[in-house]
A protein has these predicted regions:
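Iron-sulfur cluster-binding electron-transfer modules in prokaryotic oxidoreductases
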Residues: 1-322
Length: 322
C-alpha cells in the first residue's frame, strides 16, 4: 500500500504505460524501469470465491484456484485480471486463494533456507485446506511454477512426510497455459473467434508476436508449445533467433550486485526481439518481463511486453464487444 502511495513521487509511467521509470537518477535502480505498483493488489481486488456458473445448477461446474505470484499480485495485476476473463469465457469458477504466501523462490536463490522452509510449510498446509474442492491450481508464472512443481520436493528431500504431502498436491498444479491448452476447450473457443473474423468482408491482418521461452518454463517444466498453440489461433507467430536464450534476469543477486552482467545479456535478447519486427513480445514470466522490458527500453525498442493471458483475454473481450 505504501509503495503504491509513494511510487509516483519517485517514478513516472513509461510511454506505453506498462512500466515505471525513475524521475531522478537513483544509485540502486540505475535508470532502469520496473513493473508498476498497483494501488490494490490482485488478491485484494476481488472476493476469494468468484462464481461464473452456479454450481448448484450444474454438477459439471469446474473450479480452479489461482496462485498468482508476488509480481503478478503487486506489479502486473492485469495478468490475473486476464485469467479471470478467460475463466469466465470457459465457465470455470475461480478461487483466488488469498492465504497463499510467496512460493519461496527469491529466498531459495539467495540462500535463505530458513525462510524457504517456512514458506513451503505454510503453503502446503494452505493448499491442503482447499485442494479437494478445486480441479486444479493454476500458476501464471514460470518461476513460481518451477519452484512449486520441482524445487519444493527437492528442498524437502530429507523430510519424507512433507515431501509425500507435496507430491500428493502436484497432480493438480499446472502452469496456467498448460492447463488451459490441455484441459479446457479454450483452443476451440479462440479458433471459433478467428473463423468468424475471417468471414467478415473487411479483415485486418493478424497481429504478430514473438515468444520468449522463460528458462523455468521450457527448460525446467517443458512448457513452451502450449502458449504458442493458444496464441496462434488469433495471432501470427514470428520466432526470434533463439527463443530459449536466457533473458538475463538471474535473480535478486544478479539484479543488484551484477546488474551490468544482466544488462549485457538482456541487450542481446533485445536485439533478437527487435529483428523480428513483431508487434508484441510475450512470455509467461514476470521476471523475464521486468528484465526484457528494461532491455528494450534501454535499446529504444518500442515493442510492448505482454503475458500470453493478456493477449488471449484481449481477443475474448474484443469478440464480446462486437
Amino acid at each position: 500500500k505504501l509503495g503504491a502511495i509513494f511510487a509516483p513521487l519517485l517514478y513516472q509511467a513509461t510511454k506505453d504505460g506498462n512500466s515505471i521509470q525513475p524521475r531522478f537518477t537513483l544509485p540502486l535502480v540505475k535508470n532502469r524501469i520496473f513493473g508498476g505498483i498497483a494501488k490494490r493488489s490482485f488478491l485484494n481486488s476481488h472476493s476469494e470465491e468468484i462464481c461464473f456458473v452456479d454450481s448448484k445448477q450444474s454438477q459439471k461446474t469446474r473450479k480452479v484456484a489461482i496462485f498468482i505470484g508476488c509480481l503478478g499480485n503487486y506489479n502486473y495485476k492485469n495478468v490475473g485480471e486476464s485469467l479471470l476473463v478467460i475463466l469466465e469465457a470457459l465457465q470455470i469458477n475461480a478461487k483466488l486463494a488469498k492465504g497463499q504466501k510467496c512460493c519461496g523462490a527469491p529466498a531459495y536463490f539467495t540462500g535463505d533456507f530458513a525462510s524457504v522452509d517456512t514458506l513451503i510449510r505454510q503453503n502446503v498446509e494452505y493448499f491442503e485446506s482447499f485442494i479437494e474442492e478445486v480441479d486444479a491450481i493454476l500458476i501464471p508464472e514460470a518461476t513460481c511454477g518451477a519452484m512449486i512443481l520441482e524445487d519444493w520436493k527437492h528442498f524437502m528431500e530429507k523430510d519424507l512426510e512433507l515431501k509425500s504431502r507435496i507430491e500428493k498436491l502436484l497432480p493438480k498444479i499446472y502452469m496456467a497455459t498448460k492447463y488451459l491448452e490441455s484441459q479446457t476447450n479454450l483452443v476451440e473457443i479462440l479458433n471459433n473467434i478467428e473463423q468468424n473474423r475471417l468471414k467478415q468482408e473487411f479483415q485486418s491482418p493478424k497481429q504478430t508476436f514473438t515468444y520468449h521461452d522463460p528458462c523455468h518454463a521450457r527448460k525446467v517444466l517443458g512448457v513452451y508449445q502450449e502458449p504458442r498453440k493458444l496464441l496462434q489461433q488469433n495471432y501470427q507467430l514470428v520466432e526470434m533467433e533463439d527463443s530459449t536464450a536466457c533473458c538475463g534476469f538471474g535473480g535478486v543477486t544478479i539484479q543488484t550486485e551484477r546488474f551490468a552482467l544482466a544488462s549485457k545479456v538482456g541487450s542481446k535478447k533485445a536485439k533478437m526481439i527487435e529483428k523480428t519486427q513483431a508487434q508484441f513480445i510475450v512470455a509467461e514470466c514476470s521476471a523475464c518481463r521486468m528484465q526484457l522490458s528494461n532491455a528494450l527500453y534501454q535499446a529504444n525498442v518500442e515493442i510492448p511486453f505482454l503475458h500470453p493471458l493478456e493477449l488471449i483475454a484481449k481477443i475474448i473481450k474484443e469478440n464480446q464487444n462486437k
